[in-house]
């Protein structure tokens, strides 16, 4: 399900409106690697603050500056162009001196830190991100304030944001054409975008179905449960439901939904039947990820922002700060606050 307007809300549909990203400075993201660089090694880590530049462009410019092939430059995650973001780039430079990045002239970018590390920085190898958002032109301060309290206590649906689906949902449209052999997709990046969009749409559809049935916080027989903050999961057995529900209520466990691929969903019994029914209509996308041998995975149904705080600048503008684990979308938090908000599209 790619249309966010069709997805169910956890706290009911918001009534307030407002704007996000009126300026790049209203959307600030600071990467949290979750570890300290070693200080030595064959990898050069460069922390960059950028505005108006996407991640791939900066990687290309760093490769050119350091006289390296693009494949020698990596990063932990893609960051929005329409924002102020701080992220690390990794340059593989064994036996080479560290370049003097103070001479790098790249509009919209500042090098904040340079160090060495022993291991390559790969996609997903970060703990999370710190966000500072400013919502402007808020129509109802009282409602947004009440929703901020609810979100801090009860979280939000862990939906993939519209960025995942491309401009006007183009990634999904192309994925369906590819699945039906109406187009050929040779570029590796595009294949990855289309497959990710397909799995994300199916995940969103299952999460929305659980919310619609008021089962986002109810353990079903056969549910795939995850220890909070961990990636591994286990299946809920019939004789353990009461104990597992208590652990879920205490915040020790989280219910997961599928990122379908070439393999079983992972759930059993009632939960499996629920997910299969929820995925009705997604046979084309499901067949694509199976055909392309994408590995099945699971992802938490709900997202709990950490270190959440907010301050009103005036009656129509509020600054909201929070931390999210890697792979989560800040716009999924905003979606529970505002009925509609201005946002920037991300395409392939």
UniProtKB/Swiss-Prot annotation:
Keywords carried by this UniProt record: Isomerase, tRNA processing
Source organism superkingdom: Bacteria
Reactions accelerated catalytically: uridine(13) in tRNA = pseudouridine(13) in tRNA
PROSITE patterns: TRUD, UPF0024
One function term, GO molecular function aspect: tRNA pseudouridine(13) synthase activity
UniProt cross-references to Pfam families, sorted A to Z: TruD
Active-site residues per Swiss-Prot or TrEMBL entry: 80
Gene Ontology cellular-component terms listed: cytosol
Keyword hit for tRNA processing: yes
InterPro entries: PsdUridine_synth_cat_dom_sf, PsdUridine_synth_TruD, PsdUridine_synth_TruD_CS, PsdUridine_synth_TruD_insert, TruD_catalytic, TruD_insert_sf, TruD_pseudoU_synthase
One of the GO BP terms on file: tRNA pseudouridine synthesis
Protein name: tRNA pseudouridine synthase D
Organism: Pectobacterium carotovorum subsp. carotovorum (strain PC1)
């Amino acid at each position: 399900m790619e249309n966010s307007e069709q997805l169910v809300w956890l706290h009911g549909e918001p009534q307030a409106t407002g704007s996000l990203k009126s300026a790049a400075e209203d959307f600030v993201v600071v990467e949290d690697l979750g570890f300290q660089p070693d200080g030595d090694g064959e990898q050069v880590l460069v922390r960059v603050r950028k505005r108006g530049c996407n991640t791939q462009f900066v990687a290309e410019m760093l490769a050119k500056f350091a006289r390296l092939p693009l494949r020698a430059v990596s990063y932990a995650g893609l960051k929005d162009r329409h924002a102020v973001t701080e992220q690390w780039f990794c340059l593989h430079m064994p036996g080479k001196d560290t370049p003097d990045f103070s001479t790098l002239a790249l509009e919209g970018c500042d090098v904040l830190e340079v160090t060495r590390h022993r291991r390559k920085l790969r996609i997903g190898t970060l703990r999370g991100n710190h966000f500072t958002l400013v919502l402007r032109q808020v129509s109802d301060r009282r409602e947004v304030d009440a929703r901020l309290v609810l979100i801090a206590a009860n979280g939000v649906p862990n939906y993939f944001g519209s960025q995942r689906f491309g401009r006007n949902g183009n990634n999904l449209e192309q994925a369906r054409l590819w699945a039906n052999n109406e187009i050929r997709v040779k570029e590796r990046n595009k294949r990855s975008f289309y497959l990710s969009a397909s799995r994300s749409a199916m995940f969103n559809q299952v999460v929305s179905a659980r919310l619609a049935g008021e089962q986002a916080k109810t353990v079903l027989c056969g549910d795939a449960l995850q220890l909070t903050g961990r990636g591994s999961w286990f299946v809920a057995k019939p004789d353990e439901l009461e104990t597992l529900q208590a652990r879920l209520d205490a915040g020790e466990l989280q219910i997961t939904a599928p990122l379908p691929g070439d393999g079983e969903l992972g759930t059993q019994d009632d939960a499996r039947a629920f997910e299969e029914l929820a995925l009705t209509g997604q046979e084309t996308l499901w067949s694509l990820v199976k055909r392309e041998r994408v590995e099945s995975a699971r992802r938490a149904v709900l997202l709990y922002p950490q270190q959440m705080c907010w301050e009103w600048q005036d009656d129509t503008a509020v600054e909201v700060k929070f931390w999210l684990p890697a792979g989560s979308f800040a716009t999924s938090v905003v979606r529970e606050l505002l009925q509609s908000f201005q946002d920037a599209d991300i395409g392939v």
